[in-house]
């Protein structure tokens, strides 16, 4: 992440890094889900997808979209991109396809609005990433390898807290770099916590929470976690 920050503005840095964090999370989430679904068949997600059982693959894809809201084939997972990096390959075309595959898998589904444009701010052809294709590939590869160390704790059902922490950290870093403009979209954690406590005081359960000036969503996230 620090490598990216040296090449671009705080806002660009945030969009790239957050996008890659979400990509890693979605990849690990679906791989864990699919492996669990296939446990009785004695197969892993990758093994099932490389098989000739088209009915099995169709059922698995349908289950993923229904339960998770999206689908992505094993060849487009974050771990696959990391493997390409290990083999010194150019990852940019594959990475671009991977991000598009996730968004496209939700078209016509209830989750389409949630995933539409999720990675639209990631421009892998941006000159800010380097002068040459090799420069861009190296920079993005370095960032993905660095982010690969994040453990979302999916098996321990702690993914919401960890993903939320990562999101709030990135938003906070952007706000620090954006100065006064940050007030247009970001409520500092201290202010968010006070508002959240006011909202939940005396209530056992909240059905809905509305932020009329929602920007980054950090206030809603803080309320959900209080």
Would you name each region that the model predicts?
Residues 1-204:
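Non-catalytic, mostly N-terminal accessory regions of nucleic-acid modification and defense proteins
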Residues 216-226:
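Conserved SAM-binding loop of SAM-dependent methyltransferases across substrates and taxa
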